[in-house]
Amino acid sequence: MQKTKLRLIFMIIYKEIAKLNKTFPLLNEEKILLGTDGSVTNILEILFEGECRVETINQKIVANTNYREVILKVNNIPLVYAVSKTPFKNIEEENLREEIKRDLLSADIPIGKIIRKHNLETRREIKYIGIAEIDDYLKSLLKTNYSRLPKRTYNIIYKNKVLMEITEIFAVRGKLVKNTYSID
């Protein structure tokens, strides 16, 4: 039963990306970023061959929920605008809750690395895949001239509860340098 459900979710994501690609032609790396159920941080580090760093734009805690707005950068290139919402009440273990809270508040650590650091077994459920209209503020943060970019929203699930809800806008277009060497 579980395998069937996972297969259905995967097929829906595939179909959503294929449908989106017909109206907004996507780069292959955008398709991968939109559809992954793994770490975006890891994919960015592989694609851009450097460490992913976080620049926090805004952060606040309201009603025991952390709201964080960041730019993910590799080699100082802004690649992703992300907004995360972390309801701390969903982390039942007090020590873990405090450590995650400390990591989110005191350091510019990507969420993928926080999950890896604490060895959390999580899964991601994609809720939305589409295109975002980019205003001048976001164009400036992402150092892009594109007025529309790929966007997704997903939940990170830990122990059957939403650990985080994340919305990401991907600005990788025109920023990935292709290798020009050939292998003989």
Curated annotation (Swiss-Prot):
Indicate what this protein is called per its UniProt record.
Putative lyase MJ0807
Q: Which species is the source of this protein? A: Methanocaldococcus jannaschii (strain ATCC 43067 / DSM 2661 / JAL-1 / JCM 10045 / NBRC 100440)
Q: Which family does it belong to?
A: Belongs to the chorismate pyruvate-lyase type 2 family.
Answer yes or no on keyword Iron.
Answer: no
Is Lyase among the key words of this record? yes
- Does the entry annotate any disulfide bonds, and if so which pairs? none
Enzyme Commission no: 4.1.-.-
Q: Which GO terms describe its molecular function?
A: lyase activity
Q: By its UniProt entry, which InterPro entries does this protein fall under?
A: Chorismate_lyase_/UTRA_dom_sf, Rv2949c-like
Alphabetically list the UniProt keywords: Lyase
Enzyme class, first EC level, given as a word: lyase
